[in-house]
Amino acid sequence: KMLERYEIPCFIDEKQTVLMNPFIEFLRACIDMLIENYSYESVFRFLRCGLLDLTEEEMDVLENYMLGMGIKSWKKWQKEWTLAYRGENPEEVVKIEALRVRLMELLEGFTLRMKVRKATVSERVRAFYEFIVSCRIQQKLKKSEQYFEAHGEVGKAKEYSQIYAIVMDLFDKMVQVLGEESVSLREFKELLEAGLSEAKVGIIPPSTDQVLVGDMERTRLKDIQV
C-alpha cells in the first residue's frame, strides 16, 4: 500500500495460478462434456475454449442448429444431421453436417476411450494426452506465446511457455502415483482438478525499472548495481 500511495512501480514476485489459462479451460471443459454426456452447455464451453480450429461463424452456426434441433446428448452427435429447421436452406444443413463430421473425427475415439467405466488412471491419461496431441495444443500455445512476446506482454508469454510442461508433469505424477488404479470419470476429474488447483507459473518482471517484492527463498537478485 505504501508503494501504491507514493506511486512507486513494483512487481510482486510470486507464482500465479494457471486456472484461467485456455489450456486449463480446455482440459476441464473436456471432462465436463464427457461427464454431462455432451449436454448443450458443456459442448459449447468446450468449443469456445479458444483452442479448436473453428471460426466464430462456424461456432454460431453449430450453436443455432443444436438449439433448434434439440441436440444435447452424445447419442445425437453420433447420428448424421440431415434435418433442416425454420426453413433453413438444405445446402446449409450439408455444411453443418460437415462440421459435425469434423468434430466427430476429433472426438469420437477420445470419447469412447474415456467412457470405459473401469479404465485406469494410466489409460485415461494416455487417452487425454493423445487427444491433446491430435488437437495440436502445444503448437497453438507456442503461437500464443510468440504473439504475446511480439506485443510486449512478457508475463503472458512466460505463462504460455510453461503451461504445457506443467500439465504434462501433472499427468506424469498421476500415472506414477495412481497409474494402475481404476477410476470413474468423476474420480479422474477430481484428481485432475486437485492437481490443476495447485499448479502455478513463475512470471518474470515486465520491467527492470521497478521495486521487486518477494521472499528470500524464491526471489534471486543478480548483478545488483547501486
What do these predicted ranges mean?
Residues 1-226:
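Polyanion-engaging groove/track-forming segments
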